[in-house]
Amino acid sequence: IIVTSATYRQSSALTPSKASRDPDNKFLWRYPRRRLEAEALYDSMLSLAGKVPRQPSGQPLDNSKSKDRAMYILTSGRSPRGMGIEIRKMLHLFGYDPSGVPVHQRDHSVNTAQSLFWLNNKLPRYYATKLAERLLAIPDLNDEQRVTVAFRMIVGQSPRPLLMEQTFTYLDHCRIVQDLGETSSWARLILGIFSSDNFSYLK
């Protein structure tokens, strides 16, 4: 009953008239925006890079096909491509508590180190490159279509005209000014989308 209720299924979009009457959302007129947990952020990158194969519904899950997901890394102690340190660094940076002590609510602090992580750490760079390779492997797409696919895959929505224009400007900068190849240019763009609030927050 709860998950099918109108309250639970609300959008997090801001309505000025309602916000003026209930700025703190005490009456739940919109869905409260919340940041994804550390494990969900990591698994999202993993899935976008094509590292979590789809499995048929109606059958027991084969966990061996999802062994690189965060929950299995944390319980088994193994990690893909020898990046265990970077994965644990990410999980701790975004609020995962390795102590195992139960808490009623995780720390959802926002800090500069998190922003720097998306741009400088080799873990998101690796998965951004894998996603760039997936995008470039899709046949018969022009740049505008490829940008739209990228945004839909990563944040679940198409870019508006101004954002599309800014994206083309950035891609041209990567290609011409920085003299990067196609895969590297698209990987840089994907890193920028990874670092956006639209990727980290559930609306």
Predicted regions and their residues:
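An acidic, gly/pro-interrupted, aromatic-rich
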Residues: 1, 7-158, 188, 193-203
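Amphipathic alpha-helical segments that form the core helices of the histone-fold
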Residues: 154, 165-176
